[in-house]
Amino acid sequence: MKIIDAHLHIFPSEPGTDAMARGVGHENSVEHLRQVYGELEIVHGVVMGNRSLETGFHNYPRDLFHYCVGLDSLVLDRGRNIPADLPDQVEEHLKRDNCCGVKLYPGYNRIWLSDDCYQPIYDLAARYDKPVAIHMGLTAFSRAHLKYCHPLTLDEVAAD
């Protein structure tokens, strides 16, 4: 049986992230992750891309990872600043073979999934036949707003 890690984040080497990895008996590196994947017979992973819309930021080893371009709170400034060219930037990712979808973070951005700003993103995902993943439920940030990421809010978008 082939195992795929369907949701992971890769963070640059920084004192905080490196210490967190060491605290649970690991190293914060792709090389270490490759080793652990081999030991656990995990054949591939899907990186939930964060922190940037620059395509150059999302250069993961293709034999090991695909990625979803993430529209997180750093990209959308917690919903305060949505770039006018957001659809164009997202499309550049969706054109790439190693990009397998888009990830939305409504609770962190305080943007309803039914907000007009997301419609071009949904349309692009449909055009490129790639899924939209959505961070629903509890968040890792205490100042995120759960009302935006309650599972029932997805119903409005998915059912309509």
Q: Where are the language model's segments positioned?
A:
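Short hydrophobic/charged patches on amphipathic alpha-helices used for structural packing
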Residues: 34, 90-91, 155
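Residue-level detector of solvent-exposed, low-hydrophobicity positions
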Residues: 14-18, 44, 72, 129, ...
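An N-terminally biased module of ancient metal coordination in phosphate/nucleic-acid-related enzymes
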Residues: 1-60, 152
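Short, intrinsically disordered, charge-balanced linker/junction segments flanking boundaries
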Residues: 154-160
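Active-site gating/metal-coordination segments in enzymes
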Residues: 52-148
